[in-house]
Amino acid sequence: MSRTLVYAIGGNALSSPSGDDEEKAALVLAKVMSDVVDLLEAGWRVILTHGNGPQVGHLMSLDPSLPMEEWVSATQGMIGYSLSITLESILRRRNRPEANSVILTRVEVDPDDSGFKFPTKPVGPILNSQQVMSEDWDIAETVNGPRRVVASPEPLRILDIDIIRSLINQNAIVICCGGGGIPVVKRDGHYAGVPAVIDKDRVSSKLAIEMGVDALIISTAVDAIRTGFATKSEKIHRTLTIDQAKMYLKSGEFPAGSMGPKVASLIDF
């Protein structure tokens, strides 16, 4: 019987935070999709999710008048298409029969989530003194430099999970929950979008748990987890126990908006 996994691809693995070297990003994407086909050949069924931090921030800066959640939905289509067409090419080249499908995915959040009050999710490129920045932007220092940060509430429910389950049960490769999913809240019995970017690792963990999959993979643009980052005591960790991960997370080794959500998501799973 086939095993199933959720494979979360980082937005920075698809496009660098500085916004350059798109040719290199395309090569990385092709390598990731080749890895996905390797998993299929090893007997796994694969659900793909992806980030959108660099891409959604760039689009938001082009037209700030559009609601943030609409830009999230736009990146689901744009990045989903890129993943799909790259994956399709590799599938055909390696004589694989699987179809793939991109699902526009809505994710319910709590309108009173503290994430709306304390923005932590980096979006867009690394900022410099030459770039135009709005006065109402929240800016935070990341490991690569200053970036805009936006609200990032916790995912409560994946509204389109039944469609995802149906497709994976037909042995399709499902691309879903792009950019953490389109954030919506329930008002008067109806769903409405809200301005936020849900962390894709948090929703990937939620998806993995609700789908009852066998494994969760979170890929990153870095080679390993580190504690004491950028200090003399920096240490590389190739493996961590759950207890170690909890200890380091609690002590603040993994910052919000970076490695923190990844470690927390893997602990939850």
Write out the residue ranges for each language-model feature:
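Glycine-rich loop at the start of a catalytic domain that most often binds anionic cofactors/ligands
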Residues: 53, 57-65, 230-231
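N-terminal glycine-/serine-/threonine-rich phosphate-binding loop
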Residues: 1-49, 58-60, 166-171
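Short acidic, glycine/proline-rich loop/turn micro-motifs
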Residues: 17-20, 62, 186-190, 229-231
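Ligand-binding beta-strand-loop-alpha-helix segment within the catalytic cores
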Residues: 64-174
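Glycine-rich phosphate/pyrophosphate-binding loops
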Residues: 181, 185, 211-229
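Short beta-strand segments at enzyme active-site cores
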Residues: 6-8, 45-58, 99-104, 174-177, ...
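Short connector loops/turns at beta-strand edges and beta->alpha or beta->beta junctions
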Residues: 10-14, 54, 179-182, 222-223, ...
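Polyanion-binding loop/helix "lid" in catalytic or ligand-binding cores
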Residues: 27-37, 68-86, 90-91, 151-168, ...
